[in-house]
Design a protein with these regions (language model features):
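Acidic, proline/glycine-enriched N-terminal capping motif
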Residues: 1-119
Length: 119
């Protein structure tokens, strides 16, 4: 089991921006968040990497009173885990469990190795 705490993830709706020519690019907000989250993850997970299938549990503290979709936070969190090298690829995620919590870190990620390929 690996446990990391990261900044509150951006919503899926905030990850990408469209150009006038029809292209897409990562939003500056997402780029900044992903770099900060990847550094935080790498600092906390020096001893572990998961190469194969895994379960992700997310415990998220809402930053304010706005209504949010919890499922919009998965992609950015998984991308940060992959960028930090903690998981080989987010396609190996076999099970996601997530819930809002009252207190704690903005976002706590708990990874359970389902394949026994933990280094």
């Amino acid at each position: 089991m690996l446990k990391v705490e990261i900044p509150f993830p951006p919503s899926m709706n905030r990850l990408w921006r469209a150009t006038k020519g029809g292209g897409v690019y990562r939003s500056p907000e997402y780029v900044k968040w992903k770099e900060a989250a990847s550094w935080a993850i790498a600092a906390q997970c020096r001893a572990g990497r998961i190469k194969g299938p895994f379960k992700l549990t997310m415990l998220v503290v809402p930053p304010d009173k706005r209504h949010r979709d919890l499922d919009n936070l998965f992609k950015a969190s998984l991308d940060a885990l992959a960028a930090a090298g903690v998981i080989a690829n987010d396609r190996h995620c076999r099970w996601i469990e997530a819930r809002w919590v009252e207190d704690g870190a903005p976002c706590t990620l708990i990874l359970d190795d389902l394949g026994g390929k933990h280094e």
